[in-house]
Structure formats: C-alpha cells, structure tokens
Amino acid sequence: MRSVKKILWSCAVLAVVCGCTKLETPPNKNQPSGDGTGVYKVVAHRGGYQECARPDCSISSLKYAIMLRCFASECDIVLTGDNDVLVAHPQSGYLVNGLEPFDHTVAEIRAAGTLANGEPVPTLRDFIRVLQDPELNPHGMRLWLDVKRLTKNGEEIDVNHSINACYRACEIIKEMKAQSLCEFLIPTGGSIFDVVRDKVIDEYRINLAWMTCTHPDNYGKAWAQLSYDKIFGDNTAYGPMDYISAGVPLSVYNVDDDETMDAVIPYYPKLKAIFTNYPSKLIQKLRAQGY
C-alpha cells in the first residue's frame, strides 16, 4: 500500500511539473515546502502565474500556491453588473473578457470567453470554496484580495466601483464565514482606503492592508503592504524597521529576483509576509537559510 501511495504521489508531482515553466525557478520547484507541515510567509502574486504556466487569478494557479504551502495567494477582484464579485485582473485597466464588468453579468462575461486553460472566469465564491475544503487546502492558505482601481486611458473610472467591490466581497466573505481566510489589499492614495478601512476592519472583522508608503501612525489598524523600492531602495523615507518597531505589520512586494530576495530574507522572521511572482524560488531560498 505504501508503494502504491508513493507511485500516486510521484504521478501527481509529475503532472504539476508538466504544467510549469522551467525558467526563473530552481530545479526542484515543484516539491512541497519544508517538512510537509509548515507554511511559508510567502504570498503568490496572482497565484504565482509567472512561475507556473497557468492563467493568473485561476483556480489552477490558486492550487499551485496551495501546493507550495504559501501563506496566501493574491488575486484581483471586480464587481459585476449583477452584484457579484469576479476574480480577474482587468485588461487595459478596466476590462474582463473585453467587457466592462460593472455593466455586465457574470454569465455575460463568462460567455465572452474562458481562461487559457479552459476554466471559466472564477467568482470569489469559487475561490473561497477551494480554500474551505480541507482536502484541497489542508494548510489553511489565505486569499489576499486586491481591490483594483479601475482606469481607462490612464484615468481613474468612478472610484465607487472599487469601493462597492470591496464591500460586496466583505458580504460574501461574511456569508461564507471565511473572514479568517481572506484579507484585503487597498491601493495607494486615500480615495478607497479612507472610505473602507474602518468598516472592513471593525464591522466585517477582516484584515486590510494599505499600499501607500507613509508614516507608521497613518495605518491605524491596517497593515503596510509596501513595494521593495519604497523601503529598501535608495533615498527612502522609511525603512522596514520603522514599521516593525512601531508595531505595524509589514509585507513587502516586488521581491522577484536574487538581489531583492536576498535583501528581504534577513527580515523574514519579523515580516507579515513576502509577496512575489516567484513563490517557489523564494521558498527554496528560505529553506536554504533554515526557515
């Protein structure tokens, strides 16, 4: 029986290998992380799609991040015309399958095309169902929901589309009792953050991050999700220890190559998470450092 299980496990790993790119990641990129029980404080940007040949914001890329035992997988969300929430990265700043999501239903958007692997454009409910299945998500990976600021030709479309997407996502998360599995990322500036922060955190009891680099006192109960250049680059106003020492949880994104990974890893024990396009590559570096 043990031999059969080993064969089945080998086949499963082989299937994953066939679907992943050979670039940018170490040779053993598809092996489970750690000793088989741990979770790494690594967040896979849009499921780590740049590392694995799977569509971004897909169920398939979500499962890739789960397999690696990431802390979370990030995805983008938009509100539809029938008051549902799609998981999708808007094309040209505001389109999903060539349609404006706020003026079309889920059915209409799905009818316009599938993802590259044949999956329908997923809803937030689809993602949460995967996370809530203990067989599919045995280590409790979370979902980081990026509330997209929709833009057209470089100009922001009505910010209420983004605010309402955040609130509708909160309602769905609460209805599905998934508050412990979901956290929000709010883009830079105050147009969305100032409106949603307190309601999301206090009323819906869902964690929330702000992506503006500012004084630690300005985050309130939110955590800081900041780009590498903002706190590790030259001539920065604040460094990582300014947030850590002030008790503001900190996650860092745009950590995608050897230089940035090697600079951030020494802070790993004190960070909320490291956000990357190459989660397996980062995890292998963490393992090499004894984490």
Where in this protein do the model-derived segments appear?
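Phosphate-group recognition and catalysis centered on beta-loop-alpha active-site segments
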Residues: C20-Y291
